[in-house]
């Protein structure tokens, strides 16, 4: 594939509540392809595997919480990056609140196996 200015956008959703709506919004905005991975926050994993009274207390507090996150990554032309980010903001809302998620991007220097 001819290399153009490409980006990878990572979105970690702490709740699956918005996943279907986000995928529909991506599709209607011309954002196609991507990968969705089940993921787990490091704090949850540490609590699950740690010993001691403090961790037992935290484990009890977190037991009713979300077991997994959804991590979406999209490889897309740089000119579609802002569109993809806006889709996330419109569907998920402000990511700066507590336990909503995180979104970040990187420039890609090389891609193999990506089809149009």
Give the residues covered by each predicted segment:
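Positively charged, small/polar-rich N-terminal and surface patches that mediate targeting and assembly
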Residues: 1-116
